[in-house]
């Protein structure tokens, strides 16, 4: 009963909040056929891929930090640069038309932060706020799209999904971007600037459609030339089997875990692999490790993004749930790596397609490593 009233109270509070803020900030509208001279759109071409760069004079941005980001012109029109995602399962979303953007019905119920200068928005949906892979496929390549037209030195502030993780801070530092010239959408959800720049999505909202130019750009900015013998054979150890109760697997069906992870780790260690948890290292150190690797073995997941920084012809073995995507195999293809997969059906059905409790026989690993050219696996 208490929970019911709490939900009702929260609903009424949000509605009252929306009404009050609509008196402060006029609710945005869809632009009809007339031209909006406060918004410029530049066509950008990278390789054979077409993108758009948007420039707003005295525009504003509103985001809920997750599924909705609205770019609003000085004339209060919502731009096609806006993002409006709708979940189609427990974790995955699809982009919708601008007419489905929530600001059209709910307005912009947050006070504005004003920026006296040029602002480049790198917002890209909720996943890019926390996920290592999405940060490098959805966020960083937007800088390249902007650079096709303008010098990044012209930007005074960068509007980003988050700055709470070390890898975010470290990766931005390569551009000379630091805490002094970023605005986090986790803190400020409504901003206004003299000039706002935004781009279309680098891989068109599809993780499996990361482009070759994007991988080239990441390597130009970040790739290390280290050759550390210690890290020639890497096993990405998620170390998560300890989180589950093996006597009650159904309870953990939404996890992504190799049930025999310890057995796999022991086997790989016995043939010269070193076990690493990438998140325990700085981003520059991760770059050194993966650029030194000749073999990489790991479970489908964000840490596999580091394949983008491996040398040409590095051999990769990926454990992939049957419902997982092909984004890391695609990255390997673009980076010219040799990539094989062991596709595993979850022992217990998961509501999240790319997850599940998995088991991989050592014999399958031996066979795949042999096919990748490892002697005496």
State where each predicted segment sits.
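The feature primarily captures lumenal catalytic ectodomains
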Residues: 2-377
